[in-house]
């Protein structure tokens, strides 16, 4: 999965953003598990997943701040 773009994240509804965060957290858990057992091939995916979560949370916070 490639890096998520800010425009794509902004186009998501808040529910879709929450679902995306949940899916990325699950993926991150699985990747950490694979790393611990020595099965992880693409180690950069851990970093990408972490940063995608941060991007979504940042956009969600900006959206909430605009509504106030």
UniProtKB/Swiss-Prot annotation:
Family that this chain belongs to: Belongs to the universal ribosomal protein uL29 family.
Record organism: Bradyrhizobium diazoefficiens (strain JCM 10833 / BCRC 13528 / IAM 13628 / NBRC 14792 / USDA 110)
Name used for this protein in its record: Large ribosomal subunit protein uL29
Keywords: Ribonucleoprotein, Ribosomal protein
PANTHER family linked to this entry: 60S RIBOSOMAL PROTEIN L35/50S RIBOSOMAL PROTEIN L29, LARGE RIBOSOMAL SUBUNIT PROTEIN UL29C
InterPro entries in alphabetical order: Ribosomal_protein_uL29, Ribosomal_uL29, Ribosomal_uL29_CS, Ribosomal_uL29_sf
One record GO biological process: translation
NCBIfam families registered for this protein in UniProt: L29
Signal peptide per UniProt: none
A GO MF label: structural constituent of ribosome
Gene, per the UniProt record: rpmC
Keyword Methyltransferase carried by entry: no
GO cellular component: cytosolic large ribosomal subunit
């Amino acid at each position: 999965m490639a890096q998520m773009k800010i425009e794509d994240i902004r186009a998501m509804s808040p529910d879709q953003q929450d679902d995306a965060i949940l899916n990325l957290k699950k993926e991150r858990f699985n990747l950490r598990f694979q790393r611990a057992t020595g099965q992880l091939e693409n180690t950069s995916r851990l970093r990408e997943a972490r940063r995608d979560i941060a991007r979504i949370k940042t956009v969600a916070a900006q959206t909430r701040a605009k509504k106030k």
